[in-house]
């Protein structure tokens, strides 16, 4: 037997299995930490992977629900645990995801108590040649947020995307994406606006680009982002570039972060294909 993929949500796994059954392909689900989908007839692997890519691109397509109705599995018979809010947060987020979220919250509280300027003197991108060897500054600008909406928006996306990467690909992969995107998006942004900027959005855009393209090119990675969300990200970049909402946005960081994420996903998916 060959394991095709794993789903965090058992209902999503059942929908894919039901659809493949209507196509004459029998898959089975084994429940461990996630719902693992297995194929008995390995000669059909390429066909199943191609269908999986289409499924991940639009899992809400009516044909998948229709397949579940046809197979009589709209109620999969699985019993789901009910999680309180914080338990649900823990379920998706790994240690690196949590450490970053806590660090951002601590820095945000410090900025409210001490003032933005005081904290930026310690964490901002090097604003003087004498500070260029304070290497933490090339990364800690990502920890600073200047409003409640700013930090909530970024941490929500960080938890959603970063948590998925960490759970599926490991803490090391999330750390690498975070460090590279923080460094390069910060470098580009300081060329646009100088050193006085902050926020996790460059890293968030890198994760958006990475999760979307890695899911498109390597469905077996187990991560994906709906195309509508990546389109939203592009619209947001355009809106920020033309100042359509009258908001101060780190446009350089957004563009650089997205480019970094796409580039890393392309390389990783290429390497994954070579290993097959």
From Swiss-Prot:
It is a multi-pass membrane protein. The chain crosses the membrane at residues 94-114, 142-162, 169-189, 192-212, 229-249, 250-270. It comes from the Bacteria. Pfam families: Rhomboid, Rhomboid_N. It catalyses: Cleaves type-1 transmembrane domains using a catalytic dyad composed of serine and histidine that are contributed by different transmembrane domains. Its main location: membrane. The keyword Hydrolase applies. The active site is at 201 (nucleophile), 254. The keyword Cell membrane applies. GO terms for cellular component: plasma membrane. Keywords: Cell inner membrane, Cell membrane, Hydrolase, Membrane, Protease, Serine protease, Transmembrane, Transmembrane helix. It is found in: Cell inner membrane. Its EC number is 3.4.21.105. Belongs to the peptidase S54 family. Rhomboid-type serine protease that catalyzes intramembrane proteolysis. This is Rhomboid protease GlpG. The lineage of its organism: Bacteria, Pseudomonadati, Pseudomonadota, Gammaproteobacteria, Enterobacterales.
């Amino acid at each position: 037997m060959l394991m095709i993929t794993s789903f965090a949500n058992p209902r999503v796994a059942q929908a894919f299995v039901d659809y493949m059954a209507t196509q004459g392909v029998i898959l089975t689900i084994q429940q461990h930490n996630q719902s693992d989908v297995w194929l008995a007839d390995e000669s059909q692997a390429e066909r199943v992977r191609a269908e999986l890519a289409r499924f991940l691109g639009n899992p809400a397509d009516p044909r998948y629900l229709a397949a579940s109705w046809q197979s009589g599995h709209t109620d999969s018979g699985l019993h789901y645990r009910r999680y309180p809010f914080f338990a649900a947060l823990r379920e998706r987020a790994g240690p690196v995801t949590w450490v970053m979220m806590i660090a951002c919250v601590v820095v945000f509280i410090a900025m409210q108590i001490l003032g933005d300027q005081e904290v930026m003197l310690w964490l901002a991108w090097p604003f003087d040649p004498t500070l260029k060897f304070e290497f933490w500054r090339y990364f800690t600008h990502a920890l600073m947020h200047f409003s409640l909406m700013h930090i909530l928006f970024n941490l929500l996306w960080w938890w959603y995307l970063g948590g998925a990467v960490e759970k599926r690909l490991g803490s090391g992969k999330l750390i690498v994406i975070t460090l590279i995107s923080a460094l390069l998006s910060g470098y580009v942004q300081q060329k646009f606006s100088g050193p006085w900027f902050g926020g996790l959005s460059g890293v968030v855009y890198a994760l958006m680009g990475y999760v979307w393209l890695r899911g498109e090119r390597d469905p077996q990675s187990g991560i994906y982002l709906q195309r509508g969300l990546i389109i939203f990200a592009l619209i947001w970049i355009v809106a920020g570039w033309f100042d359509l909402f009258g908001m101060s946005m780190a446009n350089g960081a957004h563009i650089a972060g997205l480019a970094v994420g796409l580039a890393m996903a392309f390389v990783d998916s290429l390497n994954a294909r070579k290993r097959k």
